[in-house]
Amino acid sequence: MSSSSLPSSSPSKSSLAVYGWDGGWEAEFARFAGHGLLPGRVVRVDRGLCDVVTAEGVVRADTEFVVPRDPMKVVCTGDWVAVDPEERDPRYVRSLLPRRTSFVRSTSSKRSEGQILAANVDHAVIAVSLAADLDLGRIERFLALAWESGAQPVVVLTKADLVPDAATTAHLVSDVETAAPGVQVLAVSAEQGHGIDVLGALLDGTSVLLGQSGAGKSTLANALLGADVMHVHAVRDVDGKGRHTTTTRNLLVLPTGGVLIDTPGLRGVGLFDAEAGVGQVFSEIEALAQECRFHDCAHDAEPGCAVLAALDDGTLPPRRLDSYRKLLRENQRLAARTDARLRDEMRRVWKMRGAQGRAAMEAKRGRLG
């Protein structure tokens, strides 16, 4: 990493404002100030240790005293913490300040646990490479997690210099906009500097940079930081995929103001308790559902279904409804792992629909007979 974007080794008390310190955090920290503890923000986490920027500089801190049973409460990049004042290496994190927002995905395990990727985030920057075919369903998945986190999402289409002409770029932006209502979609070229100033002007506060490996996140981060801070690896021409360039989550200061959390490429983007986020991504379907004749309409074959009517008249693309159903089912399955009542209700619905299907088949056989 370049030293120009790393925290200063000895920032002043007021310089914590660069990292997002404000009156709200000061009020949260007041109960610790009397014990001589120091406020600081976690800029990097490594297996039980973390780097924390404080008024005294960047200190190495052990998280031994704040190891929770709940994986959602582990110390994460972006957290504000209270650390020991003693000058020793490492110091200890004594407490974690309540988070304002948190970006969470489900883990690949069957234990229904969430993995927190970044804390206290204002903007979720979703990087999507134009060097590969657009996967609108994956973009919608990222957006659901972003909205659920409480952050404002921004979709950044990277490697726009590889698109043959401006008309094609505009068409691709338009396609993504259909999957991202209420979200700004920008096409940028970090190599040529196109669109970087516009993006930088949007990113006040704390932003987290997300995307698959090969999406150009590290190159984009370097362009925003104005320095070669993040290492960049080559991408395979055959599929546009790359290796993990970033292996840890790092919090870095942007020259335009605010801070950026760069994350490793995400192969899996599982939903975690993201019902509200899914609803936000598919706000037009949620609005149509309010006009259905029945309040519990499943949008399958019910009479008076406004969603199906929109499908029939072409105002709602079938792909959008399919994606909406898929993400809702996934979110329900995850929720059912930990909610016995929901699990029983889902079984009841499945049995009822199975019985209805069998009855329909029997009736059909009777008519044919």
Where are these regions (language model features)?
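Helix-rich effector regions associated with P-loop NTPase G domains
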Residues: 2-19, 33-36, 70-87, 97-123, ...
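Structural detector for short beta-strands of small beta-barrel domains
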Residues: 35-46
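Short aromatic-glycine-enriched beta-strand elements
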Residues: 48-52
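Beta-strand/loop nucleic-acid-binding surfaces
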Residues: 58-75
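Short, Lys/Arg- and Gly-enriched loop/turn segments at beta-strand edges
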Residues: 88-97, 135
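Histidine-anchored nucleotide/phosphate-binding helix
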Residues: 137-152
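Canonical P-loop GTPase G-domain recognition
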Residues: 152, 162-215
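Walker A/P-loop
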Residues: 218-219, 223
